[in-house]
A protein has these predicted regions:
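Active-site environment of non-heme Fe oxygenases that use a 2-His-1-carboxylate facial triad
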Residues: 1-140
Length: 140
């Protein structure tokens, strides 16, 4: 369940029903890229949005993706900067995929590998179930 705050007093909650993550490593940029593909159902909609209109549904998807991305970046940044915690398994991923590259990073940065890695997150979200709707979604 993910809750999105659409304004000061209203929220929308979605249930992620399918999620797949692809991970790419770019050694030249010291970058790990996460591509997260989610399918979700709308559980609750308390925002002033007419999801019967395709444009508004797409706008809602984009706003939720942006909010999710911000939350993930904030969490990872805090865990790395304050606790040097590797909850995503960045180091293990690099070690398993490119062991020699990992050794280079370890030699260069020691325990500070995480603080010297870049990461990028791309999120795709498709709202697949919208609950009980009395009218058909239009392409307006």
């Amino acid at each position: 369940i993910y809750t999105y705050k659409c304004n000061d007093n209203n929220y929308t909650s979605i249930e992620i029903v399918d999620s797949k993550t692809n991970i790419e490593i770019d050694k030249e940029k010291n970058e790990i890229k996460f591509i997260i593909n989610n399918k979700a159902n709308i559980n609750e909609l308390n925002c002033d949005i007419n999801i019967q209109k395709a444009k508004e549904l797409i706008k809602l998807e984009n706003n939720i993706k942006k909010d999710m991305k911000k939350s993930i970046y904030t969490t990872i940044d805090k865990l790395i900067s304050e606790y040097n915690a590797d909850i995503c398994g960045f180091k293990e991923l690099i070690y398993k995929t490119y062991p020699n590259y990992y050794k280079e990073l370890e030699k260069k940065y020691g325990a500070e590998i995480l603080k010297n890695l870049n990461y990028k997150i791309d999120i795709n979200l498709k709202l697949v179930a919208k609950g009980n709707i009395l009218k058909e979604i239009t392409n307006e």
